């Protein structure tokens, strides 16, 4: 039955990671509890809550519920745990640290300077960033289609476009992927994440705030500070719901601390 469930997931266009994650949850349940029944399912949920973060708990429960639908036992489906929404943004690179990193890289490593610039000035996810080609820079945007066929257009601001075209001309590149590794192949998302951590250490910046998605957060924060249109930002970020974008209206924990220190004198 487990194998058939895995085959079902693969045919239903779930991503490889989701298939593996769901299959792992089912294996985990059967190894610990053996039989599918109401009591065992509740015990499994309690065990998950005691051992994992809420986000992981809900991922496992989603897998279990999917499996219960598959075996026609939907009446046993479990409710998800409520995730307390944080009132602040965590681990977002500050404007000062971003500018410092950007300026250091511009002097020391122009290729990595451009990676950081593109991340922060386009709001691209790192998986989207590595798809940029010279042709997209010339156009001033890239169109990316999700698995569901939804179009996401990522714009390249004119200032960045001009800078990138000069950079590409200087290295005599007129086509193909623009972000390459030392072997001349398209760089990987893991390669970007790992090298950014090294730069954080080199330039004495907190490594916790130097990772690809941090620059996407920086893009959103800066955008709202300059142009307070959350609906437009949601479109630019490729968010399905505007509620996802609302997090950027919040302060970072550091900004909250600074405000408290400044405002409260009683």
What residue ranges belong to the model's regions?
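Conserved catalytic core of the tyrosine transesterase superfamily
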Residues: 1-266
């Amino acid at each position: 039955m487990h194998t058939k469930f895995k085959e079902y997931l693969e045919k239903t266009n779930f991503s490889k990671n989701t298939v593996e994650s769901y299959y792992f949850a089912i294996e985990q349940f059967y190894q610990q509890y053996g039989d599918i029944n109401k009591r065992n399912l509740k015990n499994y949920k309690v065990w998950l809550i005691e051992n994992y973060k809420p986000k992981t708990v809900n991922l496992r429960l989603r897998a279990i519920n999917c499996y219960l639908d598959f075996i026609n036992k939907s009446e046993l489906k479990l409710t998800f745990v409520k995730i307390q929404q944080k009132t602040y943004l965590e681990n977002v690179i500050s404007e000062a640290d971003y500018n410092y990193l950007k300026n250091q890289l511009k002097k020391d490593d122009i290729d990595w300077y451009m990676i950081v610039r593109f991340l922060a000035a386009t709001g691209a996810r790192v998986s989207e960033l590595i798809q940029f080609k010279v042709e997209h820079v010339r156009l001033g945007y890239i169109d990316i289609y999700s698995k569901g066929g939804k179009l996401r257009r990522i714009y390249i601001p004119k200032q960045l476009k001009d800078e990138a075209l000069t950079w590409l001309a200087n290295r005599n590149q007129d086509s193909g992927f623009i972000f390459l590794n030392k072997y001349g192949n398209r760089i990987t998302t893991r390669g970007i994440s790992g090298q950014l951590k090294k730069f954080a250490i080199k330039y004495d910046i907190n490594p916790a705030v130097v990772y690809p998605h941090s620059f996407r957060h920086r893009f959103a924060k800066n955008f709202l500070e300059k142009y307070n249109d959350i609906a437009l930002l949601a479109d630019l970020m490729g968010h399905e719901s505007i509620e996802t974008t609302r997090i950027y209206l919040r302060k970072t924990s550091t900004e909250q601390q600074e405000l408290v220190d400044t405002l409260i004198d009683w």
